[in-house]
Amino acid sequence: MPLYTTKKSNKLRASMFDEKPAKDYDPEAEPRDGDDDQSGSEADSDVERAETEHYVTVGKSKLRKAEAPTLGPEYSGTRVSRKALEESDEEDFEDEEEDDEEDDDDEDDLEDGESETGSEEFADPDTADLERDHIDEDAEISSDNALGEDDADWAEKFTFRGSSKPKTPAKTSKKDDLAVRIKKRPTAADFMSGSEDDEEEEDDEEDLEEDEEDEEDSEEGEQNGLFDMEAEETEDDEGEDDEEELDGALLSGSDDEEGDSEEDDEDDEEGSGDEDEDEDDEDEDEDEDDESGDDDEKNDVNAELRKIMAEDEKKIVSTFSKAAEADAQKGVAVRSQRRIFDSILNLRIRLQKALIAANTFNCVEKPENFKEKPYEAAEEAAVKLWNTIDSVRNSFLPEQVKAKAGEKRKRDAIELDTPAQEIWEVLEAVEGPANKYRRQVLDKWSTRVRSTTASMTKERRLAQSAGSQSLVSVLDDQLLSADRLIKKARTPRSCAPAQAAKKVEEDADIYDDADFYQLLLKELVDQRSSDSAAPGESVATVRWAALKEAKTRKQVDRKASKGRKLRFTVHEKLQNFMAPEDRRSWEEHAIDRFFGTLFGQKMVLKEDEAEAEAAEEDEEMGGVNVEEAGLKLFRS
């Protein structure tokens, strides 16, 4: 790119970057007239000025150019002229040009020097900074400067690869232990004599001195900037020869201790070499065996763990299955108990009519034509019922109770001619042992279900102190006042309606357990109508259920208001309906005329049509009035 060296070129370059504002075109602006029309324009301007004197000057339209936001005084800066800007730009360009010219002169001088000498000039080795020149190259670093102060901690534990005796051998697995044992194996150097050790130390000292001399020579070569590659190769060869000599001395050191000949030494060396190879092979085999043994042990452990887990799962499943079976058996037992209770309650409800009939026997008078046959049939049915109840009752008793009650001999059924005293003795013989068994069963189950009866209502509690006493003791306390209970059972209520209608206070020939019967019915209704009542709360009764139902909101379609839905009632379909058929011989007009002239009176039906027809008939009859000439019934 060419350089602009003159002021004119700088201004031209600066003008290239100037942004010129775009000029808006105003269609309302009038074109500018020439100089020839100046005289005429003055006259026209006077006229226009007179016509536009009442105009008010307004600002420019904001639609064309928006006004700039007004800033405060803190945003105001110093005004700079364009001349000052151009002068500052010219000074900057002049400085850049001077720098470029100096660089060009330096390059030209370098090219001229190379062309004259024909080779590159090197800096003075005494004054040159070699470290700066070789800062990017891979120069050798002395061992003293290789590590810093911060690297001392981890460098203490660091060991080079191939070292025979590490400071802290890691013992993480069997493989690592085996490697440590291999490294600790004695070598030929361990069996060398003291003289050989001294010779080795002297050789090592000589080698160290030679190495130091080599390092000094290399440092001098680096300072001069010349590296003799051949000298380095010879030094490397000498170092390798020294190492080979040391290895040979180490391997051939065992012959001086034993005092054997050179042949024995050769045999020993061959034997030791073979032994080392054999030991290496054995070590590899041992490593493989150890690895295979470790894999087998892991597989065995995993198999044992799987077996134990499977056994534990089986035990857990068996325990859960047993618990589930026990719960299922309990549920089945509870359902069977509830079913038995419901069946007994159903039997009691059905016996209510029979009890009412039995209580009304004494109030019914015997008719004159009373026959014995129906009475005998009822007696036979009662005896049969008693035998059935007795057999069912005996079936619930265990064998021990039956033996005590004298059930070893075969029981005979009661017949019609069996006296009442014998029937009573049979009942007492069975009631004694059965009472003891019944009390044991009540005690057993009352203790088991005592915790579940905490939510029992007051009506169902037999006593307020039932929580501290057993069920049998509570029943005994209730039966102590037997006279009160007997009197209450002989008072006529719902089970003796005939005596209750006659307002009899007490009757010895009846049995009325209306209180207990009402309690059973109430429990049944509560069981059917109760929802899921919370523990500790009373069970909902029928009355409460009715009140709850009354409080619930009715299901009403609230979107059907304001005519948004059509309200209609679907009528039932008409069945066996036949529409009447018109089988009359008279026409409707004749029927209307007949009823209109009935009893000598003319009834006006459809006045307009009647007048029009009357006028037509008058015209047809030649102006004679039809009504006057017509026949009228019952005319006087």
UniProtKB/Swiss-Prot annotation:
Gene Ontology BP annotations: maturation of SSU-rRNA from tricistronic rRNA transcript (SSU-rRNA, 5.8S rRNA, LSU-rRNA)
What is any Pfam family matched here?
A: TRAUB
Q: Where in the cell is it found?
A: Nucleus, Nucleolus
Which residue ranges have biased composition labelled Basic and acidic residues? 16-32
Q: Which residues form a coiled coil?
A: none
Keyword entries, A-Z: Nucleus
- Major site of localization recorded for this protein: nucleus
Bias (Acidic residues) ranges = 33-45, 87-128, 136-153, 195-222, 229-247, 254-298
Which cysteine pairs are covalently linked by disulfides here?
none
**InterPro entries, per database record:** AATF, AATF/Bfr2, AATF_C
Q: Where is this region: Disordered?
A: 1-303
Tell me which family the UniProt entry assigns to this protein: Belongs to the AATF family.
Under what name is this protein listed?
Protein bfr2
Protein source organism: Neurospora crassa (strain ATCC 24698 / 74-OR23-1A / CBS 708.71 / DSM 1257 / FGSC 987)
The root-end lineage is: Eukaryota, Fungi, Dikarya, Ascomycota, Pezizomycotina
